[in-house]
Amino acid sequence: MAGQLKSKIVAVAVAAVVVVASSLVGTASAADAPAPAPTSGATATAAAAPAFAAVSVAAAALGGYLFC
């Protein structure tokens, strides 16, 4: 029982690290990138960041479910 609890805590911690790391990578790449031209493509780039974070969280949750 204690082993299962420990593995679930580790899985949640790994998921949190993935979310924080993806957030930091997104912030760093946005800061390094040149400002986008004011076109319709700029909104597509802005919408991709939350989608990437959602996919990261979903992948971490699936990994936690499969391996715990």
Curated annotation (Swiss-Prot):
Tissue: Expressed in roots, stems, flowers and seeds.
Residue span(s) of the pro-peptide: 41-68
Covalent lipid sites (GPI-anchor amidated serine): 40
Primary location: membrane
Span of the signal peptide: 1-30
Keyword match Transmembrane: no
Protein's membrane topology: Lipid-anchor; GPI-anchor
Keywords, ordered alphabetically: Glycoprotein, GPI-anchor, Hydroxylation, Lipoprotein, Membrane, Proteoglycan, Signal, Vacuole
Gene Ontology CC terms, in alphabetical order: aleurone grain membrane; side of membrane; vacuole
Keyword Membrane among UniProt keywords: yes
Coiled-coil region list: none
Post-translational modification: O-glycosylated on hydroxyprolines; noncontiguous hydroxylproline residues are glycosylated with arabinogalactan.
Compartment(s) where it occurs, according to its Swiss-Prot or TrEMBL record: Vacuole, Aleurone grain membrane
Main function: Proteoglycan that seems to be implicated in diverse developmental roles such as differentiation, cell-cell recognition, embryogenesis and programmed cell death.
Family: Belongs to the AG-peptide AGP family.
Protein name stated in the entry: Arabinogalactan peptide 1
Organism: Oryza sativa subsp. japonica (Rice)
Gene field: AGPEP1
